[in-house]
């Protein structure tokens, strides 16, 4: 019989695939002898089974759950559903990868009207008993029955207003009892049935709800962004309650062993007295700093410090812990490797190496390459910042600079950002439902919540700027406005926020490019030491090339020459070429562009200082270059000595029904060989000039023919290139080597790579087009149906962002396996956008690519991902 349920005493940290991160770590803390309230974990396999069984918990799993409850009763001396000595539990999710706030939690399960009355009497603390019950009704209604939290929050706010108090803790036992009754009435009105009183029914409902939350919209978005497969499922942890809300000698907190924003070594966190754990994370009350716990609970704080040291040494990483103090006694509810900003990740990794806890290789493997992106984000201009006066200040919860127009809802943030507006999302507090809006916003500002609130944790994970807990803001969400320092801000007004200092400014403060910190250099040097694959960049201008070189690029893997045709007056000459009727006319027009292209290439070679440069010849269909407005059409007609109607006829003739599969790429060079001749002259002449100026540089142009699907196409265009290049080199009397290769972006090219490799010096996978043609859908139109594919679980990722290793990847592997035996000197790279995606880089390493090429700002990501792939392979 399959084992679906494990007691905490039966597991350990190595079982995270089965028990989820939270369950595995609770088991590990139990084995370390730490004070963990006992319980059990229902496995991730049970979650998968739940979905296979049509979202039902089968009898076998249910029996094992009830058996585990009986074991818990034996350990705790309490009884589930008993009036006199009830066992109350929490039910929490726990996937194998940490997903803060994405799935659901229920506390105080096992309560009903009878039990709460006995608890109130026996504990001599009716306020605590009714507080637990009203929280349970609210959480169960929201999580299990999907009755929105807001209905209950409105009842709480109404009650506080009537009682003239501002905080939940100021409500009396009688108030909370009345609230519990109001909550049950609300539940009955929304659901049409009484609130469940049977603890077993409550438990099964809660477990189902946690399994169900694996498939909620916010979890799906988070998984897609963080490469977490749907098939993993989530575990469920059922744990005896420890109560932080029994009075002033109780409390709850969240703490990190190091600062998750900066990486500084020292306890960082927050604490609330007389509260339950969700209060800290949800950001409903703004908590006190963890250091204040020492005055309140000296013994528990001393023990907590020891636990922190034990856990960090044990896991050899910064830990994020949840804990509760019940009548002065410490209970550990969770530990996990803490989410951190990119800046903190680098510092922590370097410090752990310096402290002897980690090797260089382990430090490189610890860092999520995607987060490096945020280090290269702009910061506020120092002079402008100095001149600006902050209107107010919150907590600098996630570093960076953000400015934009104020919006008050996640939906508005998505909508405004979609039309190109930069926005700052301003909320009372964020909830997990806000994740899409948080992604779309430049930054997040909240009125409530601390450094460990949902907004702070998620923003740090996404690399977004966040200021939380600015209590000076008077918020009016309904009318979409807030007031700060006497000034009223409406939707669309501009503000700037500083996620490092927590300062809030009126208007837009200019930003400057970020400078790269010392730890960044150390980690990158280690990455370069261990990686075996080269990293190039996709760059069309000397400025891009220079930036990429600063960020560690070792060459250009793709220079798109068509972008150069749009510079200055060149477009006029190119349009003349398109509208010419004879070869001579076309050559005359191209002759005007030749010196300009040559100059561009010289600047690129100079910027690359002898490192390889791959130049792709003209690729887009000609219709992309022709004029569309009347003035430009007339200008072209005059230059050509033609009528406007004649030019319009030529433009109309270029129209294609499917231009991305039409007259483009090498097909242009076959139709108009003079274009390939001109581009070859420009490439070779530029290389000759730069080689003369820098004799010590290894200048070897790589000419790339796009969209080849047949060996005969490549032969035809290559002959034009080689004849032209050899003539130029002979005329100059120099010794210059060059290479002619092709892009593999048509499936047929991959299937016949053994033929193509006979003529090509190199292959470069153009995975944007290869993905498009393998799937048979357009990159520009896929957005119309991809969301439906995600919802239907057909796709988990956008195949244009994350390489499809099963189909497109198989074609790539096939091309290499066919091509290399025919041409052992064949070098192979990738230059699609996938070249900067970590999982795609890892795949490229596995199938033996020589290099990846990506946009300049993704170069550090690719360097780190390439190193991680090499380290993983070595340690496999």
Please place each PLM-identified region on the residue numbering.
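Short beta->alpha connector loops at strand-helix junctions that form conserved
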Residues: 40, 447-449, 468-471, 559, ...
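Nucleotide/phosphate-binding sheet-loop regions of phosphoryl- and nucleotidyl-transfer enzymes
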Residues: 1-387, 421-424, 431-436, 442, ...
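S4-like RNA-binding module at protein N-termini
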Residues: 64, 472-505, 510
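A short, small-residue-rich loop immediately preceding and capping a beta-strand
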Residues: 442-448, 466, 829
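Protease-associated
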Residues: 357-440, 503-509, 520, 524-528, ...
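Conserved alpha/beta-domain cores
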Residues: 92, 516, 526-876
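Residues forming the flavin
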Residues: 462-464
């Amino acid at each position: 019989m399959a084992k679906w349920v494990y007691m905490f005493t039966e597991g350990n940290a190595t079982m995270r695939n089965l028990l989820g991160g939270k369950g595995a770590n609770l088991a590990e803390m139990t084995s370390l002898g730490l004070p963990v309230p006992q319980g059990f974990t229902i496995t991730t396999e049970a979650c998968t089974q739940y979905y296979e069984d049509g979202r039902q918990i089968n009898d076998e799993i249910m029996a094992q759950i009830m058996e585990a409850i009986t074991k818990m009763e034996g350990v705790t001396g309490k009884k589930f559903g008993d009036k006199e000595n009830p066992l109350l539990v929490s039910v929490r999710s726990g996937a194998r990868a940490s997903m803060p706030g994405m799935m659901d939690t229920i506390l105080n399960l096992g309560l009903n009207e009878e039990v709460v009355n006995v608890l109130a009497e026996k504990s001599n603390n009716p306020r605590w008993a009714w507080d637990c019950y009203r929280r349970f009704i609210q959480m169960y209604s929201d999580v299990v029955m999907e009755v929105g939290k807001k209905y209950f929050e409105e009842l709480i706010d109404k009650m506080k207003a009537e009682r003239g108090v501002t905080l939940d803790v100021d409500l009396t036992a009688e108030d909370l009892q009345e609230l519990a009754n109001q909550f049950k009435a609300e539940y009955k009105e929304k659901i049409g049935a009484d609130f469940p009183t049977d603890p077993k029914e409550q438990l099964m409902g809660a477990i189902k709800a946690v399994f169900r939350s694996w498939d909620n919209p916010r979890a799906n978005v988070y998984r897609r962004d963080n490469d977490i497969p749907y098939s993993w499922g989530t575990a469920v942890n059922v744990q005896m309650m420890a109560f932080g809300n029994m009075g002033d000698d109780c409390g709850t907190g969240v703490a990190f062993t190091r600062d998750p924003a900066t990486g500084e070594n020292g306890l960082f966190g927050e604490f609330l007295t007389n509260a339950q754990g969700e209060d800290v994370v949800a950001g409903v009350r703004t908590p006190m700093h963890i250091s204040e716990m020492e005055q309140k609970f000296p013994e528990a704080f001393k023990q907590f410090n020891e636990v922190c040291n034990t856990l960090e040494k044990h896991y050899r990483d910064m830990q994020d812990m949840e804990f509760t103090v019940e009548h002065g006694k410490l209970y550990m509810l969770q530990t996990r490797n803490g989410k951190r900003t990119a800046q903190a990740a680098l510092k922590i990794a370097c410090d752990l190496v310096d402290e002897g806890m980690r090797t260089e290789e382990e430090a490189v493997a610890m860092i999520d390459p995607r987060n490096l992106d945020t280090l290269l984000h702009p910061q506020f201009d120092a002079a402008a910042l100095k001149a600006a006066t902050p209107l107010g200040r919150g907590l600098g919860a996630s570093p960076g600079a953000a400015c934009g127009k104020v919006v008050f809802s996640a939906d508005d943030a998505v909508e405004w950002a979609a039309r190109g507006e930069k926005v700052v999302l301003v909320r009372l507090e964020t909830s997990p439902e806000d994740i899409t809006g948080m992604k779309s916003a430049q930054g997040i500002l909240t009125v409530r919540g601390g450094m460990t609130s949902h907004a702070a944790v998620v923003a740090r994970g996404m690399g977004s700027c966040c200021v939380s807990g600015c209590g000076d803001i008077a918020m009016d969400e309904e009318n979409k406005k807030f007031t700060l320092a006497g000034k009223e801000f409406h939707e669309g007004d501009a503000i700037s926020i500083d996620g490092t200092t927590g300062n809030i400014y009126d208007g837009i403060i200019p930003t400057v490019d970020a400078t790269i910190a010392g730890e960044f250099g150390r980690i990158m040097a280690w990455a370069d030491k261990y990686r075996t694959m080269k990293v190039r960049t996709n760059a069309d201008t000397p400025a891009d090339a220079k930036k990429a070189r600063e960020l560690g690029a070792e060459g250009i893997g793709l220079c798109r020459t068509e972008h150069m045709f749009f510079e200055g007056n060149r477009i006029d000459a190119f349009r003349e070429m398109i509208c010419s009727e004879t070869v001579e006319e076309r050559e005359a027009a191209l002759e005007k562009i030749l010196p300009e292209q040559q100059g561009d290439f010289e600047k690129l070679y100079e910027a690359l200082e002898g490192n390889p440069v791959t130049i792709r010849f003209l690729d887009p269909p000609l219709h992309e270059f022709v004029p569309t407005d009347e003035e430009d059409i007339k200008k072209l007609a005059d230059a050509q000595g033609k009528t406007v109607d004649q030019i319009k006829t030529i433009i109309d003739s270029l129209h294609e029904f499917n231009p991305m599969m039409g007259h483009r790429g090498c097909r242009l060079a076959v139709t108009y060989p003079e274009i390939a001749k001109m581009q070859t002259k420009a490439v070779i002449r530029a290389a000759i000039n730069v080689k003369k100026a820098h004799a010590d540089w290894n200048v070897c142009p790589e000419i790339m023919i796009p969209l080849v699907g047949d060996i005969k196409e490549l032969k035809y265009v290559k002959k034009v290139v080689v004849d032209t290049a050899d003539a130029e080199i002979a005329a100059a009397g120099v010794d210059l080597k060059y290479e002619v290769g092709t892009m593999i972006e048509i499936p047929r090219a991959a299937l016949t790579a053994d033929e193509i490799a006979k003529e090509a010096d190199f292959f470069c996978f153009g995975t944007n087009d290869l993905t498009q043609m393998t799937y048979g859908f357009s990159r520009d139109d896929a957005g119309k149906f991809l969301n439906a594919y995600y919802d239907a679980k057909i796709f988990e990722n956008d195949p244009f962002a994350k390489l499809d290793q099963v189909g497109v990847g198989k074609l790539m592997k096939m091309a290499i396996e066919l091509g290399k035996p025919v041409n052992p000197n064949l070098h192979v790279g990738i230059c699609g956008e996938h070249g900067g995606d970590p999982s795609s880089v890892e795949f490229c390493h596995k199938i033996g690519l020589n290099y990846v090429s990506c946009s300049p700002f993704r170069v550090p990501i690719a360097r780190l991902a390439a190193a991680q792939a090499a380290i993983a392979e070595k340690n496999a």
